[in-house]
Amino acid sequence: NYPCAYGLDPTKSEDLTKGEIECRQYIKEIVSYLKSHYEELKDIEIASIAPEIGFRDSRRIVGLHKMTIEEMEAQTHYEDTIAVFPRFYDMLSPDAVMDGDETVKGRGYKGYIYEPIRDERTFEVPYRSLVPVKVKNLLVAGRCISADHVAECGIRAISLCMMTGEAAGVAAGLAVEEKKTMAEVDVKELQKRLRKCNINIPE
């Protein structure tokens, strides 16, 4: 998690290559620094490096509902909620510059936002954020659901990606049963089935 590259488009091969080169160079530099500045680390070697860099953010769909950071902060309740998750933000660089104060405030996001789970606050994810506006028989799960740039840093957690994935899978099965499009799925029935799978959804 040490090396980071900013301002790259993960859908462009040129940017992927640039990011790979930058991050691998950073790894070499930090290892060299540790070896030369810490006696106890003078003999360390690189055992392995991830086969490719991972992106925290990329394209997101335009869904029937776009989640916003304001909704998450307000703990907005939706009639079509399919997941509830602890309030958590982890964004390395909203503006591609590492100069933030680690807090979420206003719309002038800068640098580094990191707010771990500190209390009982949660946010909900509506089913509509999984449903694209223009494609009838498609559901999207994970970090690419419909959300704004900063809200994405709260929804990209792996466990929440799993929850949206489970909801999408159950909804797809329900759509087949009901012979309906994804937007027409009976959300109350979807929520009922998710609760049977021990998913904690408000009544």
What does each model-found stretch correspond to?
Residues 1-203:
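Flavin (FAD/FMN)-binding glycine-rich loop and adjacent Rossmann-like elements that form
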